[in-house]
UniProtKB/Swiss-Prot annotation:
Its EC number is 6.5.1.2. The keyword Lipid metabolism does not apply. This is DNA ligase. It comes from Ehrlichia chaffeensis (strain ATCC CRL-10679 / Arkansas). InterPro entries: BRCT_dom (IPR001357), BRCT_dom_sf (IPR036420), DisA/LigA_HHH (IPR041663), DNA_ligase (IPR001679), DNAligase_adenylation (IPR013839), DNAligase_N (IPR013840), NA-bd_OB-fold (IPR012340), NAD_DNA_ligase_OB (IPR004150). The gene is ligA. GO terms for molecular function: DNA ligase (NAD+) activity; metal ion binding. It catalyses: NAD(+) + (deoxyribonucleotide)n-3'-hydroxyl + 5'-phospho-(deoxyribonucleotide)m = (deoxyribonucleotide)n+m + AMP + beta-nicotinamide D-nucleotide. Pfam families: BRCT (PF00533), DNA_ligase_aden (PF01653), DNA_ligase_OB (PF03120), DNA_ligase_ZBD (PF03119), HHH_2 (PF12826), Nlig-Ia (PF22745). DNA ligase that catalyzes the formation of phosphodiester linkages between 5'-phosphoryl and 3'-hydroxyl groups in double-stranded DNA using NAD as a coenzyme and as the energy source for the reaction. It is essential for DNA replication and repair of damaged DNA. The active site is at 120 (n6-amp-lysine intermediate). NAD(+) binds at residues 35-39, 84-85, 118, 141, 176, 284, 308. GO terms for biological process: DNA repair; DNA replication.
């Protein structure tokens, strides 16, 4: 009895906490805690209710979904309650859901249940009612019983039909409103301060001025029809498409649980390629009649469960903001964090981007911050928990001199980045420039790791790029005996000197890239090399560009920013001296290019699936030689998708974006010279 009384007190405490956070999340669109922390509160509450079933009868709060509607909007009653879903956090939870479902439907264990597997969009749930084919009312989910009337705002959403043909006289559809990540970034760049895309979508829908909502580029996906005549969820989604609604393309139907788990893993591993936030996979019993038999609990349907992804966000303490100097002199602030597990990866550092980002989010050393990790993207700080901030924490002061060399810093026009003026006097810049110079896509000198470069620099054996090619001579004439130092032996030294000598014959493209000129990446270096063909022609044209104010370049795909960077680089005497010293040690080969006549010259292409004629890396080289730019991600700017065997999700995405799809054979033809 005493245990139950203690449990009741803990349950009341949890209910108050959850209710508080529901208001912040569903009404104010300003959550204080992460989704993972909220899920943990709900998990603790469910543990108590499962251990003490009698408390369920007095726990009225569990019947509520979300929070009461905002009083700024008219209240709307849902004729059919809008439920939330139960969550699963591992495969065992999903398997238990399958077992419960089979038991409820009197299905044998050896029989399977077809499931509709759909993405769980991290947005705002909404309902739209049509009367006689015309949009009548739209509302939020609210607490499940009552929502907010958002009809005027919802009508501003692009691609939402205002009139539907061949529909029942009374039709209610439900879905999720969201905002793309790229539109979210632009929204914050325009002066807003939303913590994440979900908050941005919810806040935009709840604007009192629908003209503001119209500017926010909201999108939606529909996922259900209330009281549908369809026989399956698969048929239901198809019917929504027929009526003109946006329906998510990443959906499969399967009666194989392993295939359902594989779908989860595929989406989880590739979610960074999807331009909107998803936080799990929803498994629904595909048969609508079975859904009706299963029914609902007070809070959620028994015929569906949301298998949540591991938290992509987590809260931890920011211990220090350090400044990293790159090879171009950019001062990049880095957050040094208390170690935190995010999606199975231990994160200790996160990007803070620039000075403006720190000031906009008011990030301070000692703060507790929300860290987000998506795919292979560098972890980023998306928000600060200011409720946990103590009074002694002061605003971060961005350095006015370079932390590495003490040189003054400056902010370039129309840029957020701050630069060190030290250049060749800045240790960090020099080391980063040398590291870039010896990298795989530049001189490709194997044996020059970060530790080795730092050692040679501290021994004053390599203080600039040219020193690499006199290293062997310097060592033989110095008192430093590498053989006596840890990590160096006769063989490792011989291998290093051999790699340096082998690198002395280099293509013009790799040479240009190796110089580390601002805005000159691998692709631009290839365009310049193809255009000028020889080192002598390129160098002389660069001198003209730097010395003659009226002289400019007219090269396809080379913009004014890049030309300005070339002009600045070749205007500096120390850069010219460095190049002239370098070429004394090198043989720079001319570019043999026939790419101008290729049908994919100047095009952006993406590969998907397995190629039968060559490896992916060989295909990349072939395409780039033909003048194309090979990208790993698909967007509306992509010109061609090259589809091999067993193409992935990019194939469907290309169709939706109207990107032209080429077979492997056709791509091979396109890479040929059109003169042949």
């Amino acid at each position: 009895m005493v245990d139950q009384e203690k449990a009741k007190l803990e349950l009341d405490k949890l209910n108050k906490q959850i209710q508080h956070h529901d208001v912040l999340y569903y009404v104010q669109d300003n959550p204080e805690i992460s989704d993972a922390e909220y899920d943990e509160l709900c998990r603790k509450r469910n543990l108590i209710l499962n251990a003490f079933p009698k408390l369920t009868q007095s726990n009225d709060y569990q019947n509520n979904i979300g929070s009461s509607p905002d009083t700024k909007f008219a209240k709307v009653k849902h004729e059919e309650k809008m439920f939330s879903l139960d969550n699963a956090f591992n495969q065992q939870d999903v398997e238990k859901f399958i077992t419960r479902t089979k038991k409820f439907l009197n299905i044998n264990d050896n029989q399977s249940i077809p499931l509709s597997c759909e993405l769980k969009i991290d947005g705002l749930s909404f309902s739209v009612i049509y009367k006689k084919g015309e949009i009548y009312q739209a509302s939020t989910r609210g607490n499940g019983y009552f929502g907010e009337n958002i009809t005027t705002n919802v009508k501003t959403i692009k691609n939402l039909p205002h009139i539907i043909h061949n529909a029942p006289d009374l039709l209610e559809v439900r879905g999720e409103i969201y905002i793309d990540r790229c539109d979210f970034i632009q929204l914050n760049n325009d002066g807003n301060n939303f913590a994440n895309p979900r908050n941005a979508a919810a806040g935009s829908v709840r604007q009192l001025d629908h003209n503001i909502t119209a500017q926010r580029k909201l999108k939606y996906f529909m996922y259900t029809i209330v009281n549908t005549a369809c026989l399956t969820q698969e048929e239901l989604l198809y019917q929504l498409k027929i009526w003109g609604f946006c329906v998510n393309e990443h959906t499969i139907t399967t009666d194989n649980i392993e295939e359902a788990f594989n779908f989860y893993n595929q989406v989880y591993n590739n979610r960074s390629n999807i331009n909107y936030d998803i936080d799990g996979i929803i498994y629904k019993v595909n048969d609508i009649k079975s859904q009706h038999i299963l029914g609902t609990t007070s809070k959620s349907p028994r015929w569906a469960i949301a298998y949540k992804f591991p938290a992509a966000e987590a809260k931890t303490q920011l211990n220090k903001i350090s400044i990293q100097i790159g090879r171009t002199g950019v001062l990049t602030p880095i957050a040094e964090l208390s170690p935190i597990n995010i999606g199975g990866v231990i994160v200790t550092r996160a990007s803070l981007h620039n000075k403006n980002e720190i000031e906009r989010k008011d990030i301070r050393e000692g703060d507790y911050v929300i860290v987000k990790r998506a795919g292979d993207v560098i972890p980023q700080i998306v928000d600060v928990d200011k409720n946990l901030r103590t009074q002694e924490l002061t605003k971060f002061v961005f350095p006015t001199t370079c932390p590495s060399c003490g040189s003054s810093v400056y902010q370039a026009k129309q840029e957020a980045s701050i630069y060190c003026t030290g250049e060749l006097f800045c240790k960090d810049q020099i080391l980063e420039k040398i590291k870039h110079f010896v990298s795989k896509d530049a001189f490709n000198i194997i044996g020059f790791g970060k530790k080795q470069l730092l050692f040679f620099y501290e021994q004053r054996l390599i203080t600039n790029i040219t020193d690499i090619f006199t290293l062997e001579e310097k060592i033989s004439n110095s008192d430093v005996k590498l053989e006596s130092l840890h990590g160096w032996g006769e063989k490792s030294m011989s291998n290093l000197f051999s790699a340096i000598n082998n690198s002395k014959v280099i293509s013009l493209e790799n040479f240009i890239f190796a110089l580390g000129i601002r805005f000159i990446g691998k692709y631009i270096a290839k365009i310049l090399a193809n255009h000028f063909s020889s080192y002598e022609t390129w160098y002389n044209e660069m001198l003209k560009l730097a010395q003659n104010e009226d002289y400019s370049l007219n090269i396809q795909q080379i913009g004014s920013k890049t030309i300005g960077s070339l002009k600045m680089f070749f205007s500096q005497p120390h850069n010219l001296n460095m190049i002239n010293d370098l070429v004394k040690h090198l043989t720079i080969t001319d570019t043999q290019s026939s790419s101008y006549l290729s049908l994919i010259h100047g095009k952006i292409i993406v590969f998907t699936g397995e190629l039968s004629s060559m490896s992916r890396s060989e295909a990349k080289i072939r395409s780039e030689t033909a003048g194309a730019k090979v990208s790993s991600s698909l967007s509306k700017n992509t010109d061609f998708l090259i589809a091999g065997n067993n193409p992935g999700s990019k194939y469907k995405k290309a169709q939706s974006l109207n990107v032209q799809i080429l077979t492997e054979d056709l791509w091979l033809q396109y890479t040929q010279s059109s003169e042949n």
